[in-house]
């Protein structure tokens, strides 16, 4: 990981988005060809184009990645793609060392995961994911920040776990995670918190 705090924070934030609403894909083609692809999907064109793409471009420039960002419109979602072996392994290696993230990286990752998988209603603050072990890591980080939470299997979503922020600690979550100066959320994704 680079020493630059902006690079590590933005990288952790983007990794949260990738894990929540995207993926790291190694695609195999005929003729023994392969493609390494980093993907983030979102319903909001504005979020992809005005917020996520500039952050990804910053990281691409910092890492001297030669690949270009592609934004593909699907039926219901927009997909940001970068075909790059270097960027693929950069994020894959980050994911392997997630337990070693410093506090800044933890906050940035949680913020990205929340933008991707979080419930933005005023009644509850929740993050969904199929990977219970990942949510347990996030839960520990939040507990260390003084934000109480619980994890359980969501009965309405088969095989998906939900991390619930305690009612008492919603404001602390908003101030600690969502209002951090790193990568401020666009108003449309802040659930009324800006």
Curated annotation (Swiss-Prot):
Protein name per its UniProtKB record: Homing endonuclease I-DmoI
EC number: 3.1.-.-
Keyword match Magnesium: yes
Pfam families on file: LAGLIDADG_3
UniProt remark on cofactor binding: Mn(2+), Co(2+) and Mg(2+) enable equal cleavage, Zn(2+) is less active and Ni(2+) is essentially inactive.
Temperature-related properties: Not extremely thermostable, has lost significant activity after 90 minues at 65 degreees Celsius, has no activity after 4 hours.
Keywords associated with the record: Endonuclease, Hydrolase, Intron homing, Magnesium, Nuclease
Record-annotated DOD-type homing endonuclease domain positions: 14-147
A single MF term (Gene Ontology): endonuclease activity
GO biological process: intein-mediated protein splicing; intron homing
Additional note from the record: Translated from a circularized intron.
Lineage, highest ranks first: Archaea, Thermoproteota, Thermoprotei, Desulfurococcales, Desulfurococcaceae
Free-text function comment from the UniProt entry: Endonuclease involved in intron homing. Has a slow turnover rate, cuts the coding strand with a slight preference over the non-coding strand.
Co-factor(s): a divalent metal cation
Enzyme class: hydrolase
Keyword Disulfide bond: no
Domain of life: Archaea
Active site annotation, chain numbering: 21, 117
Record-linked SUPFAM superfamilies: Homing endonucleases
